[in-house]
C-alpha cells in the first residue's frame, strides 16, 4: 500500500520536492508554492485519512513513515527534500529522524518538535480526544468553525476563517479523527535531541505573527526563516514569502 499523491516532473538530475500538507489539508495545499519550482520534480502527498488517502488508516508515526518510504520507492524517488506544514512538518521530522534513504534535507513550516513532559502530553491527549470525538459526531462546518478559533490561528481574519471552514469541511470526519489520534502530539516523542544530532539539512519557516512557533523555532538547531505578513499557515497567507525562502534554501 502507498499513499495517494500527485507527481509533477521537472528536469532530471535535481532532487525531488516532496510536499506534506497539514491536518485537514490535501495534496493541493502546497501546489501554489510548489509550482514555482518547475525545474524540480514535485510530489504532493495525501497523508492517511486525507484526500485520496482517506481510506488509509494508521496506528502511529511508524506506520506513516513506512507508507511514506514505500510511496517514495514506488515513484523511484532517490534524492529528495521533504517540505511539510504543521502535521506534515511533524511527519517530515519524524521520518527524517528515523532515517530515509536519499533525503537531502527537511523544510518545516510551523511543525512542533514535541512536548517535553508527561503533564503536557496528558493535557494534549485529552484535548485531541475531545476534538476527535467532535470530528466523528458533529457537522464538520461546526467543528472547524471552533477549530479555527484556537489561539494558534489568531492572525486569521473572519473572511479567512470562513474560507478555511468551507474548504476543510469537504473532509471525512471519521478518518480525520483517526489520524488526529494516531499522530497526536501526545504520542510524538520530543525530537529536539535527534534534530540537534541530525545528518541532514534542516530549515524552519514560521510566520512573523506566529509567536508560539517562532519561540519553538528558537529552541531548534535550525536555520529559521521568518515569513512576513503571515501567521501559522504562512504558505497560505503569504505564498510569495514562502517561495522566496524556499528558493534561497534550495540555492545552497
UniProtKB/Swiss-Prot annotation:
<keyword id="KW-0456">Lyase</keyword>
<dbReference type="InterPro" id="IPR029058">
    <property type="entry name" value="AB_hydrolase_fold"/>
</dbReference>
<comment type="pathway">
    <text>Quinol/quinone metabolism; menaquinone biosynthesis.</text>
</comment>
<dbReference type="GO" id="GO:0070205">
    <property type="term" value="F:2-succinyl-6-hydroxy-2,4-cyclohexadiene-1-carboxylate synthase activity"/>
</dbReference>
<dbReference type="Pfam" id="PF12697">
    <property type="entry name" value="Abhydrolase_6"/>
</dbReference>
<protein>
    <recommendedName>
        <fullName>2-succinyl-6-hydroxy-2,4-cyclohexadiene-1-carboxylate synthase</fullName>
        <ecNumber>4.2.99.20</ecNumber>
    </recommendedName>
</protein>
<keyword id="KW-0474">Menaquinone biosynthesis</keyword>
<comment type="similarity">
    <text>Belongs to the AB hydrolase superfamily. MenH family.</text>
</comment>
<comment type="pathway">
    <text>Quinol/quinone metabolism; 1,4-dihydroxy-2-naphthoate biosynthesis; 1,4-dihydroxy-2-naphthoate from chorismate: step 3/7.</text>
</comment>
<dbReference type="InterPro" id="IPR022485">
    <property type="entry name" value="SHCHC_synthase_MenH"/>
</dbReference>
<comment type="subunit">
    <text>Monomer.</text>
</comment>
<dbReference type="GO" id="GO:0009234">
    <property type="term" value="P:menaquinone biosynthetic process"/>
</dbReference>
<dbReference type="InterPro" id="IPR000073">
    <property type="entry name" value="AB_hydrolase_1"/>
</dbReference>
<comment type="function">
    <text>Catalyzes a proton abstraction reaction that results in 2,5-elimination of pyruvate from 2-succinyl-5-enolpyruvyl-6-hydroxy-3-cyclohexene-1-carboxylate (SEPHCHC) and the formation of 2-succinyl-6-hydroxy-2,4-cyclohexadiene-1-carboxylate (SHCHC).</text>
</comment>
Amino acid at each position: 500500500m502507498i499513499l495517494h499523491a500527485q507527481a509533477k516532473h521537472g528536469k532530471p538530475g535535481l532532487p525531488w520536492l516532496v510536499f506534506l500538507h497539514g491536518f485537514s489539508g490535501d495534496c493541493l495545499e502546497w501546489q501554489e508554492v510548489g509550482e514555482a519550482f518547475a525545474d524540480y520534480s514535485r510530489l504532493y502527498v495525501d497523508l492517511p485519512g486525507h484526500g485520496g488517502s482517506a481510506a488509509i488508516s494508521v496506528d502511529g508515526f511508524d506506520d506513516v513513515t513506512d507508507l511514506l518510504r514505500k510511496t517514495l520507492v514506488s515513484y523511484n524517488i532517490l534524492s529528495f527534500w521533504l517540505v511539510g506544514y504543521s502535521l506534515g512538518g511533524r511527519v517530515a521530522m519524524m521520518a527524517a529522524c528515523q532515517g530515509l534513504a536519499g533525503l537531502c534535507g527537511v523544510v518545516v513550516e510551523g511543525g512542533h518538535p514535541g512536548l517535553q513532559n508527561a503533564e503536557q502530553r496528558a493535557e494534549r491527549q485529552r484535548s485531541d480526544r475531545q476534538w476527535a470525538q467532535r470530528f466523528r459526531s458533529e457537522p464538520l462546518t461546526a467543528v472547524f468553525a471552533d477549530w479555527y478559533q484556537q489561539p494558534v490561528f489568531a492572525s486569521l481574519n473572519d473572511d479567512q476563517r470562513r474560507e478555511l471552514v468551507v474548504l476543510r469541511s469537504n473532509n471525512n470526519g471519521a478518518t480525520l479523527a483517526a489520524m488526529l489520534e494516531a499522530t497526536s502530539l501526545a504520542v510524538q516523542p520530543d525530537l529536539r535531541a535527534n534534530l540537534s544530532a541530525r545528518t541532514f539539512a534542516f530549515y524552519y519557516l514560521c510566520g512573523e505573527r506566529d509567536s508560539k512557533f517562532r519561540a519553538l523555532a528558537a529552541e531548534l538547531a535550525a536555520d529559521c526563516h521568518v515569513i512576513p505578513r503571515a501567521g501559522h499557515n504562512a504558505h497560505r497567507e503569504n505564498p510569495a514569502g514562502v517561495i522566496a525562502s524556499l528558493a534561497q534554501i534550495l540555492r545552497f
